[in-house]
Regions:
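A broadly tuned preference for mixed-charge, low-complexity surface segments
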Residues: 168-169, 255-265, 326-336
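P-loop NTPase catalytic cores that bind/hydrolyze ATP
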Residues: 258-288
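Generic alpha-helical structural element
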Residues: 40, 112, 226, 230, ...
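Nucleotide-sugar donor-binding/catalytic module of glycosyltransferases
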Residues: 1-254
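C-terminal, non-catalytic tails of nucleotide-sugar-dependent glycosyltransferases
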Residues: 232-263, 302-320, 324
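Generic structural hydrophobic/aromatic packing signal, biased to beta-strands
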Residues: 117, 165, 207, 241, ...
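Hydrophobic alpha-helical membrane segments, chiefly transmembrane helices and signal peptide h-regions
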Residues: 89-90, 272, 296
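Membrane-interface aromatic/basic loop that binds lipid-linked glycans or pyrophosphate carriers
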Residues: 282-416
């Protein structure tokens, strides 16, 4: 017997509050022949009971229990063994498909003969809905037929959410690890789609993060968790990059095309997966940030020669290594604990060794001078002046960009 048109794979763990909402958003799609495979990764709350009730009420729901909690990647891999659809999409138990979103993905896949379909997603916290700045890129937002080589900005959208993959093209792909485990899988799936990636403008996926009042961790606990997550991400980033490079070598004949994809992924890792956690550690003055500096330095040291320089030429906003990794600790040097400063010096040295023209990526002449002095002098008056100049330069740049955005918003629209 042939399988359904679409398989939706959901992994759940202690999701008693959100499971029904997630599954209901799938089952509401009555225009598609689908199955909803829900893998319970060893839940200890009411999730197993709720899942059993849902599966008993609708034959489209297939419950797959794991013997014990094994992590999201292992649970997803178990789900991949069960799904039968021609097309596959993934949904987190905390999130939901927007009404009609799954139908729009499937319609684009069928009518446009795509290898993969990429829809839009929004973020919601119960009070407002927004689009993350990281995803607000023309390669992601502008509809049309694309490939990762021609539209490397798609690499920034390396989560499995809001996408539809032809299942035959992902044969043999597996998720690995608890951190960054989905990114190489998604990038490999998109690489296998070649120039058959169809981007649609419809918002199909809602990424929901709300917490009950008083249920959140303390600021200190949350900060330490974020820093540790960054350390873990840096520790596995080299392996993730290696997987992407290997898949690109198989999928792309042109060496330049392979480097474009690899460089885009490096830029994404630095800007989002590592830079974001570094920024949070600085915001709160986390005393363990030295470990994060060391982990990022190890990743930079292990990166293939020239790849960081390639990445710096891809981002229109400037070099992510300078902007998101090297400069932020200098701009908030007073928040860097004394024991972490030696680790930062090693990080800065690794960055300069990997990208000798790093200081050229300052936003202006003052910025470049300040960065040069701060990187090569460990203290003294010139160092303190450079730090002050760096802060002034970056603040001026942010103000300029803010006013520019305001002017674009209030500028009268001309009629064609």
């Amino acid at each position: 017997m042939s399988g359904p048109a679409v398989s939706v794979l959901i992994v759940v763990w202690n999701a008693e509050r959100s499971l029904r909402r997630a599954v209901d958003s799938v089952l509401a799609e009555r225009d598609i022949d689908l199955e909803c495979v829900v893998v319970d990764d060893g839940s200890t709350d009411e999730t197993p009971r709720i899942l059993a009730e849902i599966a008993a009420a609708d034959p489209r729901v297939i419950a797959v229990p794991m013997a014990a909690n094994a992590g999201v990647s292992a649970a997803r891999n178990r789900g991949l063994e069960v799904v039968r659809g021609e097309w596959l999409t993934l949904l987190d138990a905390d999130d939901r498909f927007r009404p009609g979103g799954l139908s729009e993905l499937h319609r684009a896949a069928v009518t446009r003969e795509a290898g993969a379909v990429v829809g839009q997603q929004v973020w919601s916290n119960g009070r407002r809905t927004w689009i993350s700045g990281l995803y607000d890129r023309s390669d992601i937002r502008r509809p049309g037929r694309k490939s990762l080589v021609a539209a490397p900005g798609l690499v920034y959208y390396a989560s499995p959410h809001g996408k539809l993959f032809r299942r035959s093209s992902i044969a043999g792909l597996t998720f690995e690890g608890r951190v960054l485990g989905d990114q190489p899988w998604v990038i490999a799936a998109l690489l296998r789609a070649g120039d058959g990636i169809e981007v649609i403008g419809d918002v199909v996926y809602e990424w929901i993060r709300t917490a009950p009042a008083g249920a959140g961790p303390s600021i200190t606990t949350a900060t330490r968790a974020s820093t540790q997550h960054g350390i873990d991400a840096a520790g596995v980033a080299t392996g993730a990059l290696t997987r992407v490079i290997a898949e690109a070598s198989t999928a792309i004949a042109d060496p330049d095309g392979r480097r474009i994809v690899a460089a885009a992924y490096v830029d994404r890792l630095l800007r989002s997966d590592l830079g974001a956690h570094l920024g949070r550690a600085l915001d709160r003055g986390d005393p363990t940030m030295g470990e994060l500096f060391t982990a990022i330095a190890d990743f930079i040291d292990a990166a293939p020669a020239g790849l960081l320089a390639d990445a710096s030429r891809l981002d229109a906003d400037g070099d992510s290594l300078a902007r998101d990794i090297v400069a932020p600790p200098l701009m908030r040097w007073h928040r860097v604990p004394e024991p972490a400063r030696a680790a930062y010096r090693r990080l800065a040295a690794a960055a300069v060794a990997a990208q000798p023209d790093l200081i050229r990526h300052g936003r202006n002449r003052l910025d470049r001078w300040a960065l040069r002095v701060a990187l090569w002098e460990s203290g003294g008056l010139r160092f303190r002046i450079a730090l002050a100049a760096l802060r002034v330069s970056r603040a001026t740049s942010l103000l300029s960009r803010g006013f520019g955005g305001l002017r674009r918003r209030i500028r009268p629209r001309t009629r064609s």
